Amino acid sequence: MQIKSFLLPIVAALLTSVSAADSSNKCSFSKTSITEATAITQLNACSTLDGEITVSGSGIGSIDLSSVKVLKAKLSILNSPSIVSLNFNQLQNITGALVINNATQLNSIDLTQLTNVETLQLVSLPSFAILNLNQGVQKAGTIVLSDTALTNLNGLASFNTIDSININNNKNISKIEFNDLQTVTDSLILSFNNDDAEVKLDSLKWAGNLTIQDVSSIQASNLTSVNGSLLISYNTFDELEFPNLKSVGNSMQIFAHDELTKISFPKLSELDGELEMFNNTQLEEIDFGNLTTIKGAVTISGPFDNLTMENLKLVSGDFQVNSTSDKFDCSAFDKLHEKGKIEGHNYVCTHPANPSSSSKSGSSTQTGKSDSKSSDGSSSSNSSSSSKKGASNVLVVPGMVLTTALGVLLALI
């Protein structure tokens, strides 16, 4: 009893202290929902916002949070068709998240002082054309920019390291340049912006995953490693080259190009996943001259004449190469298969017969299996030569015909 009487005042004091701390921290909001403009004033009284705050509905025309310097909270502005502008002109650090989604009338966002961002998502903002980022973001975690009316990335391209960045479906952005970006630890996605978008990633050295879609050009001259997957599709350039890329840690897919004629990865030595290329309708040349190992399946189809893999030593999966060019040659891959260096259960290498060989063998398709080609060719040539010999052994002389006819006539008489 004495112990209880001794502890009770202490516990009461502690509870009072915690309660006082909570009541005094007016800038920490736990799952707070705001639908009216008057509630924005309370937020703007804070230099630091913490907690989880959601602004939604059509009761707010503009948001002024010009007193906020640090955003520790996750601040979400969702489904707000009436908001036309956001003012965060003193905000320097976002250590939480700023998420703006489906604000159809939003035209401008002022982030003049912003330099550090953990998470910034600007999605489904079809009227959003003005982004003020005078200082430029120097440090970033995750940035998503999707379906906006922005014409450039000024201020969003100054960082040298980022976890992930996804820029997609911004139809007015025709230039995407990250001149300082060296490392993307998770993923870099640049997809379906302006059809003529030009991409420059000349400082990029390492990426977790890389996706490039619907661009007119791509420069990544210093990229040496993609730790995950590399996906290239639906672009309009005629040549694709990664001159210094040495390794890809997962799959590589290149597909759906109508103008692409040449693919070159001259220093790529190891691919730790599948290699897949298809629907590249004008493709003529593929260069993987330094590639030694593919730790997955190979599926390549198209009109290419040359597929250079002269240093290839091992394919861990199935192998299927189908060229529609009669200039293509399967012999190098046939030899690799015969040595057991293509470890998958299925091996196919096809191309139309070369006109010169088809005249001899009569075969329209070569499978890359030397046995079937040589037997077909030899049997055709043997039958052809034997028919010629049979015809040459019959010699008809006109005098012999006349003598025979007279003998028959005299016998009848």
UniProtKB/Swiss-Prot annotation:
One of its GO terms (biological process) is cell wall organization. Residues 356-390 have a biased composition (Low complexity). A lipid is attached at G390 (GPI-anchor amidated glycine). Its main location: membrane. Glycans are attached at N93, N102, N172, N209, N222, N227, N279, N290, N306, N322, N382. Keywords: Cell membrane, Cell wall, Cell wall biogenesis/degradation, Glycoprotein, GPI-anchor, Lipoprotein, Membrane, Secreted, Signal. InterPro entries: CWI-Assembly_Regulator, Rcpt_L-dom_sf. Residues 391-413 form a propeptide. Induction: Expression is induced by growth in hypoxic conditions and by caspofungin and ketoconazole. Expression is negatively regulated by BCR1, HOG1, PLC1, RIM101, SSN6, and SUR7. Residues 1-20 form the signal peptide. Residues 347-390 are annotated as: Disordered. The keyword Cytoplasm does not apply. It is a lipid-anchor; GPI-anchor. It is found in: Cell membrane; Secreted, Cell wall. GO terms for cellular component: cell surface; extracellular region; fungal-type cell wall; plasma membrane; side of membrane. The keyword Glycoprotein applies. Gene3D superfamilies: Receptor L-domain. PANTHER family: RECEPTOR PROTEIN-TYROSINE KINASE, SPORULATION-SPECIFIC PROTEIN-RELATED. Belongs to the SPS2 family. Cell surface protein required for proper cell wall integrity and for the correct assembly of the mannoprotein outer layer of the cell wall. This is Cell surface GPI-anchored protein ECM33. It comes from Candida albicans (strain SC5314 / ATCC MYA-2876). The lineage of its organism: Eukaryota, Fungi, Dikarya, Ascomycota, Saccharomycotina. The gene is ECM331.
